[in-house]
Amino acid sequence: IEVGDWSSDVCSSDLATALSREVLASVGRAVVGKREELELVLAAVLAGGHVLLEDFPGLGKTLAARSFAQALGLEFTRAQFTPDLLPGDLTGSFLFDPRRQEFSFREGPLFTNLLLADEVNRTPPKTQAALLEAMQEGQITVEGTTFPLARPFHVIATANPVEHEGTYRLPEAQLDRFLARLSFGYPDAQEEWSVLDRRIARRREEQTVPRAADAADLLAAQEAVETVRVDPSVGRYCVALAAATRGHRAVRLGASPRGSLALVLLARALAVIRGRDYIAPEDVKAVAVPALAHRISIRPELWMTSVTGADVVREVLSGTPVPGARP
């Protein structure tokens, strides 16, 4: 199937599965390994959400974001978040045209299909708020005038761990707007050699990946994801997982209902990537940490114990009955 054919008529879940595999194969030509993490990034995009890649520098976060934009055929913009970045640097601003004697609006980097918000936690909260409106509402407001953003619109943000010098802790409201938070981690020895080998063979730094879809294809695939069946027992399992985080002894603030919704949305998309038109409990388990961990606040007195939101989610997973499983 050629680019642009996926969206012809109504995209079924089978076509969305085929599109997903084409996109992942394309991205895999640039990003070595990390298949599970790449599947989760694509699942978040297919579910219509935004992704936070939180990891140390040099582990392929920016490369992955750019590769997905190329493979999906989306208009791509990169914004480098720095301590002196202003909201207008993201949204755009009104400029006076002396020839026409009027103000005209100059669009900022938010006017795109896929925004790479690089090192998003290095900019002050005021600028982060401008990004939050775009993520939450799909629009921006400049001097009282509202501008709708393009569809599809997705943010892939990268962040360094908060222990790094010069970082601002992302506010809970903004973290909650990311459908998933992921970490690639360090590659193993074979993967790291593959990175070097590819670079040596290429003889240049830049690399591009083949386009596997376009914006219309992505929108059609997102509609197909909405048709994935959710059994009530699996839906209640998602609710039980989110609710269990609120009652955990180490948690100050557990996952909100948006967390249980994120579980369903991500699990739906992952089911499509895996070739099914229904959610299985295994899909929910696979997305639980990326969907819930960043929505959990640990009690301050436990900050020095290295307990994380991911630890809480894993403990909740092990203690919550799985649908269809015997007690």
What are these regions (language model features)?
Residues 1-11:
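Single conserved hydrophobic/aromatic residue that forms the stacking wall/gate
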Residues 15-59, 239:
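Pre-Walker A (pre-P-loop) alpha-helix and adjacent loop at the N terminus of AAA/AAA+ ATPase modules
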Residues 39-43, 96-116, 145:
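Conserved alpha-helical scaffold flanking the Walker A/P-loop in AAA+ ATPase domains
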Residues 45-82:
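Walker A/P-loop
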Residues 71-99:
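AAA+/P-loop NTPase substrate/partner-engagement loops
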Residues 97-102, 122-127, 135-228, 268-273:
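Canonical AAA+ ATPase core
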Residues 200-304, 309-310:
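Basic, amphipathic alpha-helical bundle interface domains used for macromolecular binding and assembly
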Residues 299-327:
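Terminal-proximal interaction/regulatory segments of ATP-powered molecular machines
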